[in-house]
Design a protein with these regions (language model features):
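Bacterial N-terminal signal peptides that target proteins for export
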Residues: 1-7
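His/acidic/aromatic-lined binding-pocket segments of jelly-roll/cupin-type domains
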Residues: 63, 70-73, 108-109, 116-117
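Conserved metal-binding segment of the jelly-roll/cupin
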Residues: 110-129
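A short hydrophobic beta-strand segment most commonly corresponding to one strand
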Residues: 132-143
Length: 143
């Protein structure tokens, strides 16, 4: 009976064991990318997501992503995040990504180390007033 249970368990686990696309990036490799990053460094990319480490010491410019949701975890520092409002004077590329210009209106919040942020596709956003070095991981999820 025990042998049958073990065999059944292995059969059920086979799809999990055979999964592809699993990625583990060792802490030492991430630390190397973090130390080398002037502004950002790509950790991993597929057609469904892009994972980056970003480093900011100056104000950003407004962004709005047509098809990407930003998921971020702040590692160090603090920054003022404005979301919503209206972007003007920006450029939009062929993929629907808006950069530059100015952001009017919106909601402002100060984010700190340890905070989790999720900015849905289509929402204008802007990071300003970084205090010292602002470090964060961002995964852009294609919707």
């Amino acid at each position: 009976m025990l042998n049958r249970l073990i065999a059944a368990g292995l059969l059920l686990a086979t799809p999990v064991l055979a999964q592809t696309g699993v990625l583990v990036v060792p802490a030492a490799e991430i630390a190397q990318k973090v130390n080398a990053a002037a502004t950002s460094s790509t950790i991993a990319t597929t057609d469904k997501y892009i994972s980056l480490f970003s480093h900011r010491t100056v104000d950003g410019t407004p962004e709005q992503h047509a098809n990407w949701t930003d998921v971020m975890v702040v590692q160090q520092g603090e920054v003022t995040l404005t979301t919503g409002g209206t972007i003007s004077g920006n450029t939009v590329d062929a993929k629907g990504e808006s950069h530059g210009g100015t952001l009017a209106g919106g909601t402002t919040v100060v984010v700190h180390a340890g905070d989790y942020l999720q900015i849905p596709a289509g929402v204008p956003h802007l990071m300003t007033k970084p205090k010292g070095d602002f470090h964060y991981f961002v995964t852009k999820v294609h919707i």
